[in-house]
Amino acid sequence: MSILEHASLMTDEIRRVPLEELQTRLARFREEMEKEHPGWQMAVINNKVNMYYFTGTMQEGALVIRPQDEILWVRRSYDRARNESLLPDIRPMQSFRTLAEFYGTWPDVMYVECRKATVDWLNMLRKYMPFKEYADIDGLLCSLRLVKSSYELELMKRSGAIHQTVLEQLAPKMIKEGISEAELAVSLYTEMLKRGSHGIARMNLPLGEDVIGVASFGKSGLVRTAFDGPGGTGGTCIAVQSIGSPFRKLKAGRLVYLDIPCGVEGYHTDKTIVYYFGDINKDPNRDLILAAHEHCIMLERFAAAMLKPGTVVEDIYNETMKQFDSRFAAGFMNGGKFLGHSIGLTMDESPAIANRFKEVLTEGMTFALEPKIALSGIGMVGSENTYLVTANGGKALTGSPHKLYCIY
């Protein structure tokens, strides 16, 4: 395929973020900046997720926003940025020197994404744009992304539909004796790609990295990882704490823990489902396994019912934990102190459903609820689904939690 043919293919087949969507986001950004930082003069967006949120493209460069204008400066790839983004003002840059020559003068305070910016990037920015100090806007950006538009929700609904189809309808057909954790995870991931998943799970956490998610059989689900989540895996090797082992094969009498991410055009949904391979009635731990799993289902449903406008986030956690059966305390969330998390352009958006989070819910927010219990010597049970905050409580986007199904 020639370069011209490739360019034509991109133009014909990509689905751009609508201009009115970008304009609304930029207007909300300026409104919130004026509230929190009256008199602000300039902000520089460098993180690719935030760049995508405001411009509809992910490139190496900088989005410079001022009260009167916004310009997307692109080092690489300028042509791709022009093709993908409907933002009117997109310009090429060689380095920050290009910006220095264009703007000429600088505010005393530059607003940047401190959590994502490297020291090297900040030093380079300050070298060519000698502002006196910088201030953080990560919290402001997070709050903007928290409430989803109808456009964003449509993408999440599409992702949720893929999630439900693959993990509820297709997974039982793939779970067979002798399959490895890695093979099962990859097979599920492939089915998601076929149906339109964008193929990656983006994280806010610096150490967060994931593509396929996790498939764990039995006790391997108890192996804790560096990632701040309840589910575990031995991974493919020491260097990769994800996917699952290519050598651990499924045998009868094991729990099958599946936490496989999905997303459409940048927007994610989160879902975990647990199956039992074999006849659970022959398992000496049958009653414990079923009781723990059903308890997680109850907790998820209870928390989901509280996902209404006006509810304080920490109240969801505290009220749900009042329903918690203390006999499962040792393994609940594998030691974590949360029930779920906001989700959208990244899997682990803030706030978490946990104590001391004071945010008040509004319609359009989306959360993943994931009560899970680690059963010592057995494996992980529980559930996870993504919900939309509505006046009637959480509306499931990925399907509802269900009982533990046995696969023979």
Feature-to-residue mapping (PLM):
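Active-site neighborhoods and metal-handling regions in enzymes and metal-associated proteins
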Residues: 1-408
